[in-house]
């Protein structure tokens, strides 16, 4: 797994995506942080010029860079597994004197090293710029430690998920699509369940949503990033009391989710990494190019797609929680999915260039 030839081949296969990941990370994090300091300095000079009262404001969310960088990491994982399956490059790779498990671990470690390097470098640049720029007068750096730790864990979990999905899919399209579906499914499940309850019991659509959302929060990879906000605001009018009765006075209005939210992404890493190694070592090359490598899994995906697709169609077509219109939409959408999806899953995608 530490063979130089494997690492060089992995880099050559994905170098453009890797460089895109580095450039986007520095632009969306360090560059924007620096430009914000220049902007605030400019506001201060303008306020002094016009004798206005200056209010320093800085706001940084974790979810936005997670979604942006996570998307690129998904493309990276698709490039390392889905692309080589699609153009049959895996046949040559697996004929080399390397264990399949070592090939997979090399791909995983390659991505993890890039993630760790990017996060640590941006972490250090933030610390340097905070001390040397206008931010130093108004910020404390302690929230940024949690910010980058949470970012590191969540990005590793997203990459691990995308790579693991590549062990059950046969081309780059299905790997990317299925990764997105699995990632957002815990976000969509609460409104789907509460919507069905509302249609059948005339209970308010959002009444049951909170409890289901709390359950899904414990299994979502993105859970640690969803409510993470670093906010420095020197405006006394922004002081408030949160839902737990804690008084937040200016200037630091930072909101950091509890550490227990990290359990979900860490659990995904611990489960999906060995699962991915196991499945990759037993992948069937003869089904490369198909949307799914395992026929039994294809049946499960088909059943789930018909069922949940029907629910979505029923909720869209139901009017004012009308039960008949819900079932009409459910049956129509399920039939359309049942008719077209098996035909799509039989397609085989194969490109003969590398």
State each model region's role:
Residues 240-268:
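Individual transmembrane alpha-helix segments
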Residues 80-116:
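Helix-loop-helix units of permease transmembrane domains in multi-pass membrane transporters
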Residues 176-186, 329-333, 354:
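Central hydrophobic cores of alpha-helical transmembrane segments
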Residues 62-64, 143-155, 259-267, 324-335:
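Alpha-helical transmembrane segments of polytopic membrane proteins
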Residues 51-62, 110-179, 187-196, 202:
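Secretory targeting signals
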